[in-house]
Amino acid sequence: MMMNAFFPAMALMVLVGCSTPSPVQKAQRVKVDPLRSLNMEALCKDQAAKRYNTGEQKIDVTAFEQFQGSYEMRGYTFRKEQFVCSFDADGHFLHLSMR
């Protein structure tokens, strides 16, 4: 009687271990128009200069990251104050976060 329950349980365990792994998902990369990224950088520098009460020439943007529905630019002031500018998928400025 135990054998009748043992074989289906073993067969189920063997079949579960044989399932194929799911394919690796990769993020889509869209090439950003250089003019758009330069405009976003200028807007980010302008907003940071206003927030930190300094000139745009004293603002450095160091990183540009693309996410699924947005963009972020990281930077810092000459006083080493860090910030992040966020943009929507169309490149419109959303907000500036001080770090």
UniProtKB/Swiss-Prot annotation:
Q: Which Pfam families match?
A: YsaB
Q: Which stretches are annotated as coiled coil?
A: none
Record keywords: Cell membrane, Lipoprotein, Membrane, Palmitate, Signal
Could you identify this protein by its name? Uncharacterized lipoprotein YsaB
Underlying gene? ysaB
InterPro entries given for it? Answer: YsaB-like
Bilayer topology = Lipid-anchor
Q: Which organism is it from?
A: Shigella boydii serotype 4 (strain Sb227)
Covalent lipid sites (N-palmitoyl cysteine): C18
